[in-house]
Amino acid sequence: MDVYFFVMEITSFLKLLSQTDGFGFGIFVIGCSSQFFNLVFLCCLLLLGLKFLSFKGTSLFLQYLEKINRISPNIEFFNSFNREHKDCNNNNNNNNNNNGFISKSHLADGLDQKKPIILHWSSDSTNRLSWENCDLLLLRDGLDHIQNRENTVALSETELDEKNHHGEEEESEDEEESQSQNDEDQLLDVITLRTMVKRERKRGDYMKKELEKERRAAESAAEEAMAMLLKLRMEKSVVEMETKQYKRVAEQKQVYDQEVIQSLQWMLMKLDDDEDKIQM
């Protein structure tokens, strides 16, 4: 309602502002300054309204939290009920419609020891039946629950120890199997390595034989090549000697021919002289 009145007042005030042409004095009334101030004032009003709403919302939220805190002590969680609670349960079932308890179906479901149940206690309950006995029974239930929890923890620890022991045995068996597999793998690796070494040795011997054959063939080819070179050198030397001889013979023949030509020329000249003398 407060918010409604506040909004109504704001709307009426906005109507008044829209009806006025401007406010101020002197130079502030000139031009569009009145509209600018109206806008600024509207922004301020909006901020104030938001602050008021946020404060109102937080106060409502705090009131809601206080109500929850008032109701929460009246809610209790139970883990199990035994057959010794028949009196307390009968009283609770008789006062189910008056004291605001849960229905019989929910209570029957809650009697299972493995399921927790929630009892909503009303603030205006007038019939208080054997609260002390119920508290004692609830304390006993809590102690039994703690003992059961300790027993379950001990059993879980023993189970964990057994599981760890079985796990260690399985790990040891796995390690033995892995060791045996590793030994077998090592044996297989050794056998394969031996076969590979033998194969490589055979291949090496074969390659050595082939290299020896190639070396011998290369040596024989080199010897043949050397013999051919020697033969060619000898032939070359013979040819050179023959060419020298032919050249010398040709030179001697040329000299002889020149001498013969000169002698013939001298004889012709002599014959010409003799003929001239005879004609005279």
Swiss-Prot record:
GTD-binding domain sequence ranges: 188-280
GO molecular function: myosin XI tail binding
Residues passing through the membrane, by range: 22-42
Composition skew (Acidic residues), residue ranges: 169-187
UniProt-listed PROSITE patterns: GTD_BINDING (PS51775)
Entry coiled-coil feature ranges: none
Keyword Transmembrane helix: yes
Keywords: Membrane, Transmembrane, Transmembrane helix
Cell location: Membrane
A Gene Ontology term for the protein's cellular component: membrane
Keyword presence, Transcription regulation: no
Name of this protein: Protein FLOURY 1-like
